[in-house]
């Protein structure tokens, strides 16, 4: 090993020494450099040109040891220098190729470390994203489980509802089959009844339908022929069909002791106007016998034999109205219409027996007919409301036209009055003397005042009679004040002529409404009504009294069955419509 003398020994020269430690030390292995061609001896690498660096500490140690051990000899000096040289080897001793290889290796290591960091970061991000996705999938799985449970619950509920609906359908089907069987039985019974009608016709002479509380459908309300619309024709047809299948209670006013003896259902009102003939009975006999079978509890009354309705004013034929055989003088021995004796009529009602099935069937038919009648009335109500709206619009237009014509007439009247005043004043000045001028002025003023009063009275009458404005009467009443001044009595006459026309139209309207209501409500409580007569005079309103009607209503409420109460409820609905 080469040793370099320090500054303490300037005379010392470099020398080579061989130590046993050189053989013991192994060859240095550097990756990428240690190959067969790259292995060199240590002696070649050691050049005497001083590429070797010595540290200051080593040099000082070597100098101290040299100073302390001067007498020991060269052997110790060589050993110390060789040890320092072995420890001071560096990379500068390598060749350029080795240095390049080492630099490339360092760059590769740096790049690999950077890639490692990038891949680690990427793996961490991917791991986090995967964890998020896993959490989302778990949440979705939980939601799916909950939805599945809810759907299972709904499925169970739907199954329960389906089972209930199937039960309901089965019950309805059973009810339908039962109703069909009942209808078939009812039809068979109707056929049997129709076959029995022929056998009962022989006894129908003794048992007239008027003996019961059944009004004749074709003569119950016979109105005079009036112009009717198609709606009224259909309503009248439905009313006739309805009357054929229902009992018609009619109010009759009796003394109080007679009302206590007789059921309210059997009372009839039979009145006759003096100048009117009775109508011919046209009711069919088997239908009345059928009603007699249905209603055996109704006690027959003699007055019902003659209960034949009359004409349009609701003025009726009046036979005596005593109910019991205690008054034989007030009624003839036989009825002039049905030609039957009272004995046969009194004793013939107990022969018929009640038929429960026919009662039920007829009550059902009545209910159906009442419901149909109610529907028809609702339709008619809508139509009438529509027509009423149209009539109201027409009435408003007519009122506007009338108001305009009144304004025009007032203007014309004022102009005529002004012209007449001027003409009369000039004529008076010409034909009369000057001393009478004051009196003429007074007369002019009074005449003008009377003319204005007459015009105002005429317009007030026209306001009252808006339904039928009479322009001819107004122009006829207005006269020339100069020739014939109108007295105050003419104003009263004009007002009275206008008011009865209004009363007549309103009474006609109320009478038609009351007749319609009474025809639609056969089982409803009878109400006091007035029947004005055009030919025989006014009807006596005092004949109908409320006190016996209240007692009859109480009796009717006590003897009614649930079926009759239900019919009355439907009839009240129809009456309300």
Curated annotation (Swiss-Prot):
Domain of life according to the entry: Eukaryota
Biased amino acid composition, Basic and acidic residues: 254-263, 449-468
Disordered: region residues: 251-282, 425-444, 449-492, 520-540
Keyword Repeat assigned: no
Coiled coil residues, start to end: 91-167, 358-402
Free-text tissue specificity from the UniProt record: Widely expressed.
Name of protein: Protein hinderin
Organism from which the protein derives: Homo sapiens (Human)
